[in-house]
Amino acid sequence: MSKKKIGGVIVSDLNHTNYGSCLQAYATMKIVQALGYDLTFIKYIKQRNVWDWLKITPGLMLSGGFELLDQKKKFKDDCKRYADYMSNQQIRLNATNAFKKQEFVPFFKEYKGYKSLCEGSKLFDAVFVGSDQVWRPFGFYSNYWNLNFVDDRVPKFSYASSYGVSSIPSIQHKGTKRYLERMKMVSVREMKGKEIVEQYSNQKAQVVSDPTMLLTSKEWLEFASHSHKETPTEPYIFCYFLGSREDIRKEAAKLSMHTGFKIVIMRHMDEYVPADETIGDYAPYDINAWDFVKLLSNAAYV
């Protein structure tokens, strides 16, 4: 008897360096496969014309587009201002891409253009989306993350999806109700997501664990054993910061002074943060997902 084909809309693309997203994708893949299903990562290559862009641009701008443009401008400015920033980011990107090419890409199925994506959905016994911040307002207009492309006859569900915001724009309320009510089952990873789902649709949402929590510590240690990176032999503090808050960086420095332990830090994860340059005894960039989990598991403090 052949395995049922499951399509996954999962944050797993190349050229992104978020380790959390990478580990969530890996855990999701392993769990679905362990349940006996044939998993395919559904990949959408957009092919939009000028008219397509004109139709969605107002919505994009009202859903975080201006902030995204500001982030892109800041990244370009920081690359010019700080000599090693771009080259170090490329080192990190190469490492994460190498992992994804080995673990994820063999299960990718690419669809070029929306029509092809819709037709491709008919090949699956079910399609799901998750986890991570797959329902951020900015991604609404792709009709990809919300599974609008999936044929009506194909069962759809979400696993541990997140909006990443406390509220969604009013312009998306009707569309949110529409895509949620097409799903057989909705699960989210936080209470705010549950509130949004139940406020704007007739669906009931279940709050579930992040997929990384579904693998055992033994499984994660086995995963980390694939790392060829040496970690410090003496006790160390591992720091992985998203955002630019200086207070948590100062607390890490205080802990280092109090314990005498050195700091291993992943600098400038989602933006250039000057404070990152003020702490850390070891700041590696050539770190893949296996190395990341190894650094976590061997640390005295995280």
Q: Residues of each region from the PLM?
A:
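Aromatic- and Gly/Pro-rich donor/ligand-binding loops
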Residues: 6-178, 225, 249
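A conserved, positively charged/aromatic
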Residues: 177-182, 296
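Donor nucleotide-activated moiety binding/catalytic core segment of transferases
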Residues: 205-213, 217, 273-302
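Conserved donor-binding/catalytic core segment of Leloir-type glycosyltransferases
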Residues: 229-243
